[in-house]
């Protein structure tokens, strides 16, 4: 079995309906996977039931059987029984805290590396990398470790944008990622713009969508990655 993981930057593009832009990206992963488990742990400002309902509605045209992990008495068994794993956005620190709390980090990695499809967006993409050290989120809770799922062996920065509002004096996203590369100059960071996604199929990694991504690594800063690029070298 080979890895089949889709890492979406966001759940929306502009004013589009929830997850609608991602349907063409998601559909190929559902060909042989009907029963999906949704992990809503990043959703801090809403109930898990509300979050689940929005995902079910957003993906309704795919006619999938989606349940929330919070509905199952044994979260680990729920992961094992599912055909595929969905992890939504929200607060990455809270998400990873709960994954460690229920002893799911190593299990999810094992299942995905053995071929179980994985779809994450925003925080769900953040945790697919080596660690969550390049998330945009506020550290509202402290997980036991920043080490994440390592489905891809580099860092991700979803919702990437280097826009600076006029008159704003805070750091840009590029400046924040530069700080990371000063501390860890050998680990690549891929910034994925809203509407874009990374798709890992075995030892192949490609960029989907209509916008470039951006690479940060050591002295290389904000290097554009053209749409459709083969990024398989980042898996080495």
UniProtKB/Swiss-Prot annotation:
GO terms for biological process: proteolysis. Its main location: cytoplasm. GO terms for cellular component: cytoplasm. InterPro entries: Class_I_gatase-like, Peptidase_S51, Peptidase_S51_dipeptidase-E. Keywords: Cytoplasm, Dipeptidase, Hydrolase, Protease, Serine protease. GO terms for molecular function: dipeptidase activity; serine-type peptidase activity. Disulfide bonds: none annotated. The active site is at residues 122, 137, 159. It is found in: Cytoplasm. Its EC number is 3.4.13.21. Belongs to the peptidase S51 family. This is Peptidase E.
């Amino acid at each position: 079995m080979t890895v089949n993981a889709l890492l979406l930057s966001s759940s929306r593009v502009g004013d589009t309906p929830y997850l609608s832009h991602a349907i063409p990206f998601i559909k190929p992963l559902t060909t042989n996977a009907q029963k999906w488990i949704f992990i809503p742990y990043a959703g801090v400002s809403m109930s898990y039931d509300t979050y689940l309902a929005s995902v079910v509605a957003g993906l309704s045209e795919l006619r999938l059987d989606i349940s929330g992990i919070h509905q199952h008495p044994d979260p680990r068994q729920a992961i094992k029984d599912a055909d595929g794993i969905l992890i939504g956005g929200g607060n990455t620190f809270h998400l990873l805290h709960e994954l460690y709390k229920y002893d799911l980090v190593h299990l999810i990695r094992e299942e995905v590396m053995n071929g179980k499809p994985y779809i994450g967006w925003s925080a769900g993409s953040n945790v697919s990398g080596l660690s969550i050290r390049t998330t945009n989120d506020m550290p509202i809770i402290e997980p036991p470790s920043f080490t994440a799922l390592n489905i891809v062996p580099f860092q991700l920065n979803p919702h990437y944008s280097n826009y600076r509002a006029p008159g704003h004096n805070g750091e840009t996203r590029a400046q924040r990622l530069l700080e990371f590369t000063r501390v860890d100059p050998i680990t690549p960071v891929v910034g994925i713009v809203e509407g874009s996604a990374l798709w890992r199929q075995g030892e192949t990694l490609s960029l989907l969508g209509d916008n470039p991504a951006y690479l940060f690594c050591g002295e290389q800063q904000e290097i554009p990655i053209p749409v459709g690029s083969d990024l398989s070298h980042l898996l080495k």
